[in-house]
UniProtKB/Swiss-Prot annotation:
Reactions it catalyzes: an organic molecule + reduced [NADPH--hemoprotein reductase] + O2 = an alcohol + oxidized [NADPH--hemoprotein reductase] + H2O + H(+); (5Z,8Z,11Z,14Z)-eicosatetraenoate + reduced [NADPH--hemoprotein reductase] + O2 = 12-hydroxy-(5Z,8Z,10E,14Z)-eicosatetraenoate + oxidized [NADPH--hemoprotein reductase] + H2O + H(+)
Sequence similarity: Belongs to the cytochrome P450 family.
Compartments where found: Endoplasmic reticulum membrane; Microsome membrane
Residues where N6-acetyllysine is found: 249, 375
Needed co-factor(s): heme
EC number: 1.14.14.1
Keyword Secreted among record annotations: no
Gene: Cyp2c37
Protein name: Cytochrome P450 2C37
Length: 490
């Protein structure tokens, strides 16, 4: 038989088999657009704005639908009811971590953020317990944040009211807080090694939010066989991990098991007990990736939110004026802000909540995975299926937040000007995979922003109406555009 004919017949059979398999799977899964063989539904997704693509598809297929990202089915949950029903009402079944190829390759299933099963359960339980032991939720951690807020204010004073890019200054403060928790140390804001780390973290966020990385996560083979920005991601990730491995080595040499100093000490003393059969090198690798997760998440998410908050306050000076008026009335000029002040500052609290809602920092959270076969809303979702939860669809729900595309602290105020909670406020996600550092992040945002506005007036370099607050990238994170401003001492 003609070899070309054999090849054509073989490819045709593979094509039909692929169609049959996808059709068979789709009969069980929620509805969705018909996928093409091999490439799935990638042509129906705008990799520059995945959130809008998800919203458009939800209007056709409803709040629970199936997409094929490559050849793998992925269930998308859109809207508050679907997200809550899955992550809260069926929390155990949706507590797995879905495929995230770039991180799967970098972490090898270790650490806190991207591990699964018992590895994740043990690591999360240990991490939460240790963070509490180190003062999370207590006065001691507030003291650390207040001290760093004072350092931040002093660093901003050194700009002498001149135009500056706030990216790294605002990143140093939350980074120093998490460094003090992980390895009991902080850095000077001008330390070259420190700024190098900050630069690598900032670059990682941009790379992860780029269209190219969205494509790589859909077609993981590209990570191994194609050039691209993912190579720089792996290089930066390895640099940060190696920096932390050096800190771990220093801790091993100075460890006193009777007096644990920080997160690394607690892990070296207790953290490997449940994995006692694991080789020492694997346990140290797991520790390194765990603290890399804490270091990265504890720095970049808060610093990006702070940066976006400053940009929005420049854009809306009437909001800034109201916050500063409240700061003057409640705190004054002669003491540092503290967390007790928050309950007496409803407008400031509402402003910070509105920043987090409006910027939609991690629009689709991290991917989940169902840990067992489950019947969900009359659909069958098999074990191992990746699930994407659209936090953006919840934070921008027009029934809960009128004019959701408008920045308005009134979304979190009642008719009497009191702070109003909302179940739809889930920037840290919800359920069993909710961000472990939520409490610390909320404390940092309040204390850092109030300290800045207590001591400085924010002066933009252009008229507020000309300030663009549109994200420069929307992928894993919503990345704000670059900007400069002047911090004028008040």
């Amino acid at each position: 038989m003609d070899p070309i004919l054999v090849l054509v017949l073989t490819l045709s059979c593979l094509f039909l088999l692929s169609l049959w398999r996808q059709s068979s799977e789709r009969g069980k899964l929620p509805p969705g657009p018909t996928p093409l063989p091999i490439i799935g539904n990638i042509l129906q997704i705008d990799v520059k704005d995945i959130c809008q693509s998800f919203t458009n598809l939800s209007k056709v297929y409803g709040p629970v639908y199936t997409l094929y990202l490559g050849r793998k089915p992925t269930v998308v949950l859109h809207g508050y009811e679907a997200v809550k029903e899955a992550l809260v009402d069926h929390g155990e079944e949706f507590a797995g971590r879905g495929r995230f190829p770039v991180f799967d390759k970098a972490t090898n299933g270790m650490g806190l953020a991207f591990s699964k099963g018992n590895v994740w359960k043990n690591t999360r339980r240990f991490s939460l317990m240790t963070l509490r032991n180190l003062g999370m939720g207590k006065r001691s951690i507030e003291d650390r944040v207040q001290e760093e807020a004072r350092c931040l204010v002093e660093e901003l004073r050194k700009t002498n009211g001149s135009p500056c890019d706030p990216t790294f200054i605002l990143g140093c403060a939350p980074c120093n807080v998490i460094c003090s928790i992980i390895f009991q140390d902080r850095f000077d804001y001008k330390d070259r090694d420190f700024l190098n780390l900050m630069e690598k973290l900032n670059e990682i966020t941009k790379i992860l939010s780029s269209p190219w990385l969205q494509i790589c996560n859909t077609y993981p083979a590209l990570l191994d066989y194609c050039p691209g920005s993912h190579k720089q991601f792996f290089k930066n990730y390895a640099s940060i991990k190696n920096f932390l491995l050096e800190k771990i080595k220093e801790h091993e040499e100075s460890l006193d098991v009777t007096i644990p100093r920080d997160f690394i000490d607690y892990f070296l003393i207790n953290g490997g007990q449940e994995d006692g059969n694991q080789p020492l090198q694997n346990r140290l690798e797991h520790l390194a990736i765990t603290v890399t997760d804490l270091f990265s998440a504890g720095t970049e998410t808060t610093s990006t939110t702070l940066r976006y908050a400053i940009l929005l306050l420049l854009k809306y000076p009437h909001v800034t004026a109201k916050v500063q008026e409240e700061i003057e009335h409640v705190i004054g000029k002669h003491r540092s802000p503290c967390m007790q002040d928050r309950s007496r500052m409803p407008y400031t609290d509402a402003m910070i909540h509105e920043v987090q809602r409006f910027i939609d920092l991690i629009p689709n959270s991290l991917p989940h995975e169902v840990t067992s076969d489950i019947k969900f809303r009359n659909y069958f979702i098999p074990k191992g299926t990746t699930v994407i939860t659209s936090l953006s669809s919840v934070l921008h729900d027009s029934t809960e937040f009128p004019n959701p595309e408008k920045f308005d602290p009134g979304h979190f105020l009642d008719e009497n000007g009191k702070f109003k909670k909302s179940d739809y406020f889930i920037p840290f996600s919800t359920g069993k995979r909710i961000c472990a550092g939520e409490g610390l992040a909320r404390m940092e945002l309040f204390l850092f922003l109030t300290s800045i506005l207590q001591n400085f007036n924010l002066k933009p370099l252009v008229h507020p109406k000309d300030i663009d607050v549109t994200p420069m990238l929307i992928g894993l994170a919503s990345v704000p555009p670059a900007f400069q401003l002047c911090f004028i001492p008040s």
